[in-house]
Amino acid sequence: MAHFDLPLDELRTWRSRSVEPEDFDVFWADTLAEARGHELGARYEPVETGLRTVEVYDVTFAGFGGHPVKGWLVVPAGARDPLPLVVEFVGYGGGRGLPHTHLLWASAGFAHFVMDTRGQGSGWAGGATADPVGSAPAYPGFLTRGIEDPHAYYYRRVFTDAVRAVEAARAHPLTDAARTAVTGVSQGGGITLAVGALVPDVVAIAPDVPFLCDFPRATTITDRVPYREVGHYLKTHRGSVERVAGTLAYFDGVHFAARGRAPALFSVALEDLTCPPSTVFAAFNAYAGPSKAIEVYDFNDHEGGGPFQEQVQLRWLAVLLTD
């Protein structure tokens, strides 16, 4: 697919038309207070993986509603002192997968926590976390589950799980809470933006080709799922356009970006039909942290920079978390 979105010079000034709810901050403060009414109950069970360079823990903690959420904690073998921590959120449809697929950050000397995504994990990497909450009728996928009520919306649970995942990761004695970064690709990047706003003391965030940004633009510019799930839903629920837009505004990465407090490293791919460039730049341009940078991959689709972006992230986080 050739370039289809705005020219790069216009992308650098693009601003979302998403309208921020007046009670955005109250909504999220109340949501997290409700979640913290449940004991975190983080449990770490050592796992024998056959890997010699890392040690792995199977983690369970209480997320939204006190529901059990899984994760992996991967640390360098033999680590005895608290390590800088990277918390990672995974892409749409995937789960935490198998431990041996998560070696990058521990190999660089970091503690690495990978959160499973509730109800997902059957698309491309296995998951182990159920979503026990039902919803009103939805289009197949996750993006429209509970979409007519922000309190019932699927991503309210996921974003809350993610905040609790940071708390669970920080509770382990081999992690240094004062040196915590969050990252993720696609859906994981959108979750990263939310956590960067909802956990004010993270040191850095690295959203990679982030999903869940600039919904008014995203749901009308691309035919590719997941965003297209919203259009398919509204084909049937014709009278729900305003209610759906109102719900999505509580979960738009643009509004979380406006509350960012940490240095941020974004990435964008100019041929990305899944997370169109203008939606990523909408979040980047709104980002309010003390510093920000964006890597632009001119001829890539949703794979983005892949290992090239990981290389950039490694150098960037080495400065922020270890110097």
What are these regions (language model features)?
Residues 97, 103-104, 108-160:
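Cap/lid segment of the alpha/beta-hydrolase catalytic domain
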Residues 193-239, 296:
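Hydrolase active-site cap/lid region
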Residues 260, 266-268:
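Short beta-strand/loop motif that positions the catalytic acidic residue
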Residues 270-275, 303:
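Acidic catalytic loop of the alpha/beta-hydrolase fold
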Residues 281-323:
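C-terminal catalytic histidine-bearing segment of alpha/beta-hydrolase fold enzymes
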Residues 71-75, 81-93, 112:
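Short beta-strand element of the alpha/beta-hydrolase
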Residues 1-55:
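N-terminal targeting or regulatory segments adjacent to alpha/beta-hydrolase or S9 domains
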